[in-house]
């Protein structure tokens, strides 16, 4: 039977014996994507993409639709879970040198960009006060592009300001992009299995492999169970933990919130954007904060793949992790000293991690006489 052959192939998939829990986040991302698609579909059925009705339709979903509150909370908190998993997944890739599998890394970075775009469009849909102003600030960055900026912004907005056409096209984009994410995820997994996963030691795993089932399937199920428990606990007891209080008010173009900030998972990029006092410079830094990941496979000079045996690079990596958290924290603060100085130093250190990668590799080769 064909399905038995598929199961057999899945069961016989060879996996390195020593891959740790950090390798489980890929399957967790797949679970998050499935959850977002299902809950998103049921929300789209009841949502109305109109500036006069969008906010009311969200209230209608949470109050009147059976289990609508659960769908809405699962979708919103599921997005946060998605980003927690993807940031850990990327950190694992950076630490253990998974980026040397070039095609997988480049498709993964493209997936991250698509995911961030989808999440941004989704944040605008409730048409709350913070949704509206976050959309205004971010789409306005297009005007920084020389010559084409103003035309592109007007084209994106569908008018001379953010209005009904903007919301309609953002809903359309939020609906269509996940299908692109599914396609690219399939390609990402396909490219990964061309070469197979790396392992914590960064060595060739061919000499010591085990079948995927039952070992990795049970390991995946354990992590998925832990994630599900966390998700349901937050949905049941702290549903508004990630929400902005301003977003409980309907969008008002005449009143600017005291402090405009995006969802927590965009804070690091927003912090880098704000740290540069020039509009075009900030927009470029924002773009580069993600695009710089693409440089990693091409700047790896060390003879060792994993950071497990690279103490200098370990120090650099954990400094980078702390920097990521510091930028996210400063992005929640007002634009005034000392926060501006801290965010500028942190943004510089963020980019220094990627710039120092080839230097550190060369230095470690020299020290270890490799």
Swiss-Prot record:
SUPFAM superfamilies: a domain/subunit of cytochrome bc1 complex (Ubiquinol-cytochrome c reductase), Transmembrane di-heme cytochromes
Bilayer disposition of the protein: Multi-pass membrane protein
Keywords from the UniProt entry: Electron transport, Heme, Iron, Membrane, Metal-binding, Mitochondrion, Mitochondrion inner membrane, Respiratory chain, Transmembrane, Transmembrane helix, Transport, Ubiquinone
Chain positions recorded as a ubiquinone binding sites: 193
Coiled-coil parts of chain: none
Binding annotation for heme b b566: 89, 188
Cofactor(s) the protein requires to work: heme b
Compartments reported by the entry: Mitochondrion inner membrane
Further facts: Heme 1 (or BL or b562) is low-potential and absorbs at about 562 nm, and heme 2 (or BH or b566) is high-potential and absorbs at about 566 nm.
Stated role: Component of the ubiquinol-cytochrome c reductase complex (complex III or cytochrome b-c1 complex) that is part of the mitochondrial respiratory chain. The b-c1 complex mediates electron transfer from ubiquinol to cytochrome c. Contributes to the generation of a proton gradient across the mitochondrial membrane that is then used for ATP synthesis.
Similarity comment: family membership: Belongs to the cytochrome b family.
Quaternary structure annotation from Swiss-Prot or TrEMBL: The cytochrome bc1 complex contains 3 respiratory subunits (MT-CYB, CYC1 and UQCRFS1), 2 core proteins (UQCRC1 and UQCRC2) and probably 6 low-molecular weight proteins.
Protein name: Cytochrome b
């Amino acid at each position: 039977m064909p399905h038995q052959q598929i199961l057999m192939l899945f069961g016989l998939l060879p996996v390195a014996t020593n891959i740790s829990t950090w390798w489980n986040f890929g399957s967790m991302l797949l679970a998050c994507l499935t959850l977002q698609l299902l809950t998103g579909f049921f929300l789209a059925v009841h949502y109305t993409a109109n500036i006069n009705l969008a906010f009311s339709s969200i209230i209608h979903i949470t109050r009147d639709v059976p289990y609508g509150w659960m769908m809405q909370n699962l979708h919103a908190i599921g997005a946060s879970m998605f980003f927690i998993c993807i940031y850990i997944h990327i950190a694992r890739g950076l630490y253990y040198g998974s980026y040397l599998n070039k095609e997988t890394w480049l498709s993964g970075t493209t997936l991250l960009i698509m995911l961030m775009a989808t999440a941004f469009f989704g944040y605008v849909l409730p048409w709350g006060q913070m949704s509206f102003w976050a959309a205004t600030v971010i789409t306005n960055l297009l005007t920084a592009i020389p010559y084409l900026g103003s035309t592109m912004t007007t084209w994106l907005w569908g008018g001379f300001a953010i209005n009904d056409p903007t919301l309609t096209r953002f809903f359309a984009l939020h609906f269509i992009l996940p299908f692109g994410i599914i396609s690219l995820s399939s390609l990402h997994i396909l490219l990964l299995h061309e070469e197979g996963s790396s392992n914590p030691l960064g060595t060739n795993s061919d000499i010591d492999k085990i079948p995927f089932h039952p070992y990795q399937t049970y390991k995946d199920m354990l992590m998925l169970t832990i994630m599900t428990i966390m998700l349901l606990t937050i949905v049941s007891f702290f549903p508004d933990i990630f929400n902005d209080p301003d977003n409980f008010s309907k969008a008002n173009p005449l009143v600017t919130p005291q402090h405009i900030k995006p969802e927590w998972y965009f804070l690091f990029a927003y912090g880098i954007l704000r740290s540069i006092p020039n509009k075009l410079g900030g927009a470029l830094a924002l773009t580069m904060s993600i695009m710089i990941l693409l440089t990693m496979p091409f700047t790896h000079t060390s003879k060792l793949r994993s950071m497990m045996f690279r103490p200098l690079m370990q120090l650099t990596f954990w400094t980078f992790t702390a920097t990521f958290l510091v930028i996210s924290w400063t992005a929640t603060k007002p634009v005034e000293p000392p926060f501006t100085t801290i965010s500028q130093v942190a943004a510089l250190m963020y980019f220094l991690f990627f710039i120092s990668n080839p230097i550190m590799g060369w230095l470690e080769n020299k020290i270890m006489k490799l």
